[in-house]
Swiss-Prot record:
Family of this protein: Belongs to the class-I aminoacyl-tRNA synthetase family. Glutamate--tRNA ligase type 1 subfamily.
Organism, scientific name: Sinorhizobium medicae (strain WSM419) (Ensifer medicae)
Binding site for ATP: K256
Subcellular location: Cytoplasm
Name this protein carries in UniProt: Glutamate--tRNA ligase
Reactions performed catalytically: tRNA(Glu) + L-glutamate + ATP = L-glutamyl-tRNA(Glu) + AMP + diphosphate
Length: 485
């Protein structure tokens, strides 16, 4: 295949805050396109209508643009293979699904959600992995026609071979073999007429002429389904490349429960996009020590997709901080540095909102750093002394911190109103006054007993940062309880 024919894509779902993992996969695809003189495409996969929102889509586009990634086709700029938003392509998918059914490779399933849940519970109880049991495979054509004509809700599933295995070549993992018995009869078309991720993914990649699909290793197990769909439609599958997931320093999967993972966190704290891309790009190249500081153009030049490691890429915050510091000191002139600072301040929603909250709480501008600095720190350096003024024992504070953390996870819409509502309910369940519950939280979140309003601050910091700070605070307070302080 000629390099000029290479077409890759990043296809995020707008269901939450843009994740650094999305930037990681996007950067690989971007560099792959640059390396081969190909095209980098952006597609929005919003088949999950209940969780996808225009607000999150805008955040995704803004985050990828902030990262310095430019696409030649996408929902914001159009292109010859549009639309580039799956919800705008709904009518495109159904003929492909009907083709699969007509050729005997798919079937209509009338099982209710209740029946499917009972089936899964029984399978789990028997120690078996939950998957569809094929009940509707045995329905006659006449019964299917009758039930469809009666308007009975149903989905369309794909048939799976009953023996043998799927063998394929992956650009990272090499030769892979997955037994068909491990593959579920995947739903292709939901009852509401929307395709599932798997169906839409294959159809869109085909119609958008995608030649290489690079995504996270969590999708490796789905390749047999995708290969089957390509075969059922008589289409040639792309080259698959499954990248190792980013992991924490302890080798656990990178997740918002352990570290801040949203791109907005890094923008708010003043990380340079060039440094973040530099940091992520180092996972895709082979370099000698001392050559780590690289621009996007240099990353593209050194990009080496043939020697990718299956070992998890370690997301080392300290290394990112080191690279960011080097970028500030070595790559920016004094004028560029000043421009970066001003741009960061002007475009920083967290700073803007923090200033609003600070205005009525300071008498001099010089007091602002002490009051609001906690909004921009990655580590508060929390010590037992910070809790000295809280009128509660370490044991009581620990109980509050441990009780509040899971309750805050229940919040669907993270804002000051929902945070206050949940904490009031938590205080009532604990038989305490709200003031007693928020006192240790105030210190945990801000590192001080004099700061900005708690609920507003928690909203500004975001769920993942608050989660991390409460976890650290619980560790500090636990040490106080253990030492008898």
């Amino acid at each position: 295949m000629a390099d000029s024919a290479v077409r890759v894509r990043i296809a995020p779902s707008p269901t939450g805050e843009p994740h650094v993992g999305t930037a990681y996969i996007a950067l690989f695809n971007y560099l792959f396109a640059k390396k081969h003189g190909g095209e980098f495409i952006l597609r929005i996969e919003d088949t999950d209508a209940t969780r996808s929102t225009p607000e999150f889509e805008k955040k995704v586009l803004d985050a990828l643009k902030w990262c310095g990634l430019e696409w030649s086709e996408g929902p914001d700029i159009g292109g010859p293979c549009g639309p580039y938003r799956q919800s705008d392509r709904k009518d495109i998918y159904k003929p492909y699904v009907e083709q699969i059914v007509a050729n005997g490779h798919g079937f209509r399933c009338f099982c209710t959600p209740e029946r499917l849940e009972q089936m899964r519970e029984a399978q789990r109880a028997a120690g078996k992995p939950p998957k569809y049991d094929g009940l509707c495979l045995s329905l006659s054509a006449e019964e299917v026609t009758s039930r469809v004509a009666a308007g009975e809700p149903h989905v369309v599933r794909m048939k799976i071979p009953t023996e043998g295995s799927c063998k394929f070549r992956d650009g990272v993992y090499g030769d892979v073999e997955i037994p068909w018995e491990a593959v579920d009869m995947q739903v292709l078309l939901k009852a509401d007429g929307m395709p599932t991720y798997h169906m839409a993914n294959v159809v869109d990649d085909h119609l958008m002429k995608i030649t290489h699909v690079a995504r996270g290793e969590e999708w490796l197990a789905s390749v047999p389904k995708h290969i089957l769909i390509y075969q059922y439609l008589g289409l040639e599958p792309p080259v698959f490349m499954h990248l190792s997931l980013m992991r924490n320093a302890d080798k656990s999967k990178l997740s918002k429960r352990k570290n801040p993972t949203s791109i907005s966190y890094y923008t708010a704290l003043g990380y340079l996009p060039e440094a973040l891309m530099n940091f992520l790009g180092l996972f895709f190249i082979q370099i000698a020590e001392g050559e780590e500081l690289l621009t996007m153009a240099e990353l593209a030049e050194k990009f080496d997709p043939e020697n990718l490691s299956k070992a998890g890429a370690i997301f080392d915050i300290q290394k990112l901080d080191w690279l960011n510091a080097r970028w500030i000191r070595e790559k920016l002139s004094e004028e560029q540095f000043a421009a970066k600072v001003l741009s960061w301040a002007m475009d920083n929603d967290r700073l803007r909102e923090g200033l609003k909250l600070s205005q009525t709480r300071i008498s001099k501008l010089g007091e602002l750093p002490d009051l609001a600095a906690f909004l921009f720190k990655s580590d508060l350096g929390l010590q037992p002394a910070a809790f000295a003024g809280v009128k509660a024992s370490p044991e009581e504070m620990l109980e509050i911190l441990n009780t509040v953390q899971p309750d805050l996870e229940k919040i669907l819409e993270w804002n000051k109103e929902s945070i206050e509502t949940e904490l009031r309910a938590c205080a009532e369940r604990m038989g305490k006054k709200l003031k007693a519950v928020v006192a240790p939280l105030f210190v945990a979140v801000s590192g001080s007993q004099r700061s900005l309003p708690l609920f507003d601050s928690m909203e500004l910091l975001g769920r993942s940062v608050v989660r991390q700070r409460l976890k650290v605070a619980a560790q500090v307070v636990a040490s106080m309880a253990g030492s008898g302080k």
